[in-house]
Amino acid sequence: AAPVELKTNKVYPIENYGSSMAPFYSTLSIWIGGIVLVAMLKVTVSENGTTGLKHLKLHQIYLGRYLIFLILGLLQSTLICLGDLFYLGIQCKHPFLFLLAGWVSSIVYVNIIYTLTVSFGDIGKAVSVVLLVMQVAGTGGTFPIEVAPGFFKAVYPLLPFTHSMAALREAVGGLYAMDYWIDLGKLCIFLVVFLIMGLVLRKPIIKVNEAFSEKLEETKIM
């Protein structure tokens, strides 16, 4: 006879390992999709492309080109999330919220990668890859953040993956209070920051890049 009877009450249960890892790999795929876009498509408008359009301002070029990347990014994220839901058949308590989190993540990620690339060129692409590696290691995607080194614990709240995965996990396992919307709100802060960089700070950044390129050419190294 058992003197103690254990009663288990599961809270936000996840059915299988694949469903628990879906938020991480979906987030990772959306970011990689953004990197692929800037690698395949031009982020700037050529002189031939502006024929007949006079006095185009930097913010008009920035937003016009970003719209193309935004549409393609949303298509990518839709395919990824629908693939999770209907092809892989992951557990998901709130399918629409899962899709919404994927869309918001794509809007933010594509903007970050696009802004870095249009502002810094190839250096911006490299920074996007570095950010990818940092976020894979430092956002608790595969292991709890509590077991990560101190550096990653410090930057954990400052990385976009953190809030995307949290929102996607809420959609998969079930909502708790307003956490889902709070995570999406935090994610949108990155969008505001990089929009300011692309629309306001880009002009002085371009001047610095041009000066740097001229100095680099003078060295004859590259």
Model-derived features: positions:
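Membrane-spanning alpha-helical segments of multipass transporters and channels
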Residues: A1, E5-M222
